[in-house]
């Protein structure tokens, strides 16, 4: 089954600009209660995923305080997790192995422009329904 049916479009996704600040990331992730968010570059392309762990390690390893996180650019924060994106024409079967290690799967078009995400929840629900039907 094509993934477009399960896509949460970009305008409904909480994401961060890669040139934003660490403070913006902390505040947005806290407000929405997310542990990971997609990063988008100036051209609208998917640029990776920022996690709470990335932020915590940055603070621990550099001695930052909350007050000076506004000086740190997101693009300068090392990321320890790679959320592999898929193209919009992918099939659900392509997402199963990614969902094991990713909270969400970023979806891009043929020009690598970020168009949305598919959450792990939707992938699990899809396979749960298939499993119940095939029982």
Q: Language model features by range: what are they?
A:
Residues 1-13, 70-82:
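Bateman (tandem CBS) regulatory domains
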Residues 15-33, 40, 84-102, 108-110, ...:
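The conserved cystathionine-beta-synthase
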Residues 29, 37-54, 99, 107-122:
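A glycine-centered beta-loop-beta connector
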Residues 1, 10, 26-28, 48-49, ...:
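Short, flexible segments with low predicted structural confidence
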Residues 54-69, 123-135:
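A short, polar/charged loop-to-alpha-helix boundary motif
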Residues 61, 79, 84-86:
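Regulatory sensory and allosteric helical modules in signal-transduction proteins
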